[in-house]
UniProtKB/Swiss-Prot annotation:
This is Large ribosomal subunit protein uL30. GO terms for cellular component: cytosolic large ribosomal subunit. CDD domains: Ribosomal_L30. The keyword Ribosomal protein applies. Part of the 50S ribosomal subunit. Gene3D superfamilies: Ribosomal protein L30, ferredoxin-like fold domain (3.30.1390.20). GO terms for molecular function: structural constituent of ribosome. The gene is rpmD.
Length: 59
């Protein structure tokens, strides 16, 4: 079974760069306190690094 991580949006996407808003949508996050469980891949890790100031990650 693939390793998964939980990603929670903790800051608003209002007044953020359009690229960062698109990254949040790509991760499946829509609003504050929304949590999604994703497969831990290099692509997902890269997306998380880009918006790390808006999300919380749980292994």
């Amino acid at each position: 079974m693939a390793k998964t991580i939980k990603v929670t949006q903790v800051r608003s996407s209002i007044a953020r760069l359009p690229k960062h808003k698109a990254t949040l949508r790509g991760l499946g996050l829509r609003h504050i306190h929304h949590t999604v469980e994703l497969i831990d891949t290099p692509a997902v890790r890269g997306m998380i690094n880009q918006v790390s100031y808006m999300v919380k990650v749980e292994e």
